[in-house]
């Protein structure tokens, strides 16, 4: 997040990261014809326009950790709400896109934390060989509401007949978006997974964890295994995946291999390099964003783009929670 031009990589590429960290985004559009594509594209464009150096400087220059987190929460929440409003307005202007909407999940990795903001049922997970597997987001869905109310056992939620019914999204003209936010302290060898319900709606968390655990040293294979797992059980929805590997500093001496280049560690940064494996749907613009390299940056990110599996869309309903 260091320059004004945003790019999508076409081949394996090492991205240096500056003081603004890196941003991971998944937006899973919904609606008839191409309306879902339009909604997710608007959401991504809104996020892109929000993450400018001028706006980010006001946050990253804060020295108080509590003030920084509060500022980031406000910033991400406002960005998601702005995307919601832009989608609603676009729907009013073009009748062919009425009813369009999108989920969104954002992970902003900055300094020694990940800041997560989401609306809908696209998820953010983190895996660490030492600390295990954790879902960092919480679905905005009818089934999750039943679990929260004690009306449904968590182990029965996955197979519930209404597990695709969401209660929040971007683009609903009758209900303004209400995103949630949380932060997470980074650990060495954390692997982040952002995904649409095309993966987590078909594969149990335990299966996702097992695939990441077995392939944590080769996330390209990991990506393939996750997609294959979703397809093996039906694959009725688009599968969008973002994988991000956090690597702690190993040495101050640069290595010869560009893919493993190590830069000197900033004094206030524990984690020196982030390896990003971004697997998204470029056509829908719903998977990920990151900025053009800044050569003077202290961190590096390794990008491995790939195709996202596209299947025939199924309807995703949006409702307000109702008593059971």
Residue spans of the language-model regions?
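PP2C/PPM-type serine/threonine phosphatase catalytic domain
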Residues: 1-324
């Amino acid at each position: 997040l260091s320059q004004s031009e945003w790019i999508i990589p076409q081949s394996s590429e090492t991205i240096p990261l500056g003081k603004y960290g890196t941003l991971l985004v998944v937006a899973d559009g919904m609606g008839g014809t191409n309306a879902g594509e339009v909604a997710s594209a608007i959401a991504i464009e809104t996020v892109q326009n929000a993450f400018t150096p001028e706006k980010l400087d006001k946050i990253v220059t804060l020295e108080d950790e509590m003030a920084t987190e509060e500022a980031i929460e406000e910033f991400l929440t406002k960005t998601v709400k702005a995307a919601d409003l832009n989608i609603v307005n676009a729907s009013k202007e073009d009748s062919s896109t009425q009813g369009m909407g999108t989920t969104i999940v954002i992970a902003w990795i900055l300094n020694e934390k990940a800041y997560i903001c989401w609306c809908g049922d696209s998820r953010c997970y983190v895996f660490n060989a030492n600390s295990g597997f954790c879902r960092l987001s919480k679905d905005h869905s009818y089934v999750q509401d039943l679990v929260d109310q004690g009306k449904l056992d968590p182990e029965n939620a996955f197979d519930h007949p209404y597990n695709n019914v969401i209660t929040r999204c971007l683009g609903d003209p009758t209900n303004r978006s209400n995103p949630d936010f949380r932060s997470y302290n980074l650990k060495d060898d954390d692997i982040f997974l952002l995904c649409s319900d095309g993966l987590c709606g078909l594969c149990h968390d335990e299966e996702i964890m097992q695939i990441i655990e077995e392939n944590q040293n080769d996330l390209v294979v990991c990506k393939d295994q996750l997609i294959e797992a979703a397809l093996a059980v039906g694959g009725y929805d688009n599968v969008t995946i973002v994988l991000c590997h956090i690597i702690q500093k190993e040495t101050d001496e640069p290595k010869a291999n560009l893919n493993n280049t190590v830069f000197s560690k900033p004094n206030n940064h524990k984690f020196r390099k982030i390896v990003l494996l971004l697997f998204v749907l470029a056509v829908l613009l719903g998977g990920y964003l990151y900025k053009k390299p800044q050569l003077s940056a202290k961190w590096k990110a390794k990008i491995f783009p790939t195709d996202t599996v596209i299947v025939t869309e199924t309807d995703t309903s949006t409702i307000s929670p109702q008593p059971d």
